[in-house]
Design a protein with these regions (language model features):
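Charged C-terminal helix
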Residues: 203, 222-225
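Short, conserved SAM-binding/catalytic segment
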Residues: 208-223
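Core catalytic lobe of class I
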Residues: 1-206
């Protein structure tokens, strides 16, 4: 699927993939630095590195902190990092080749420089500037999804943040694993076009029911699933 994602992306297309930092893979002999190995696979496909975002959950779940038999002992402490990250990459151009409508709208204002020349400068609301700075900082705080519709359910905050910073309005967002439709909801809410792919009929029905209200209240008149 990585190869197919690379193939269908435009030359200035970006990709954002949410992965755990580490995993326990018995077939590989135990724990591995998963995000690093996943990036190497992306690099082999042809993706170029755009950045990495550290995800910080507002109320992180707790996991086993010590291995069996090592409680209050140095013998075999199980040191586990439950954190996840988002790997950002692009196809050929890190800069958008076609200008689009940004997520943040500034107000053009004429100002004079020290020599009295009049220039036009864009001014942005403080909240917009704060949001932009938080998105480019590389650490995104998100609220956990407590209403799990499927095993594939994840926080709406994550795709929303990625879509805001990586795409223009009316761009096409592709989710190759649609699940319960979280990315589609984020894209629809933020005025992006979207395509969702899902093999499970059960998940497809769940996503369809979830996305329909947002489509009906927004600009799309027809939902094809």
């Amino acid at each position: 699927w990585l190869s197919e994602s690379f193939r269908v992306l435009k030359d200035d297309g970006r990709i954002a993939i949410n992965v755990p930092i580490e995993m326990n893979v018995q077939e590989r002999g135990g724990r591995i630095l998963f995000n690093s190995e996943f990036w190497m696979r992306m690099k082999e496909v042809g993706f170029k590195f755009f950045g990495m975002v550290d995800l910080t959950e507002d109320s992180p779940h707790r996991v086993r902190q010590t291995a069996w038999g090592s409680w209050m002992s140095n013998s075999a402490p199980y040191i586990y990092n439950p954190k996840e990250c988002v790997i950002l990459a692009y196809k050929k151009s890190s800069k958008k080749l076609t200008k689009g409508e940004s997520q943040w709208k500034g107000t053009p204002t004429e100002v004079k420089d020290e020599e009295g020349n009049v220039k036009t400068k864009m001014f942005y609301e403080d909240e917009d500037k704060k949001e932009f700075m938080n998105l480019v900082f590389g650490r995104w705080e998100y609220f956990a999804d407590t209403k799990s519709l499927t095993k594939a359910t994840f926080s709406l905050d994550i795709p929303s943040k990625a879509i805001k910073i990586l795409t223009y309005k009316n761009d096409i967002v592709l989710d190759p694993f649609m699940g319960s439709g979280t990315t589609a909801v984020a894209a629809e809410t933020l005025n992006r076009r979207w395509i969702g792919i899902e093999l499970s009929e059960n998940y497809t029905n769940i996503a369809k029911d979830r996305v329909k209200p947002f489509v009906a209240s927004n600009r799309q008149l027809k939902l094809d699933i």
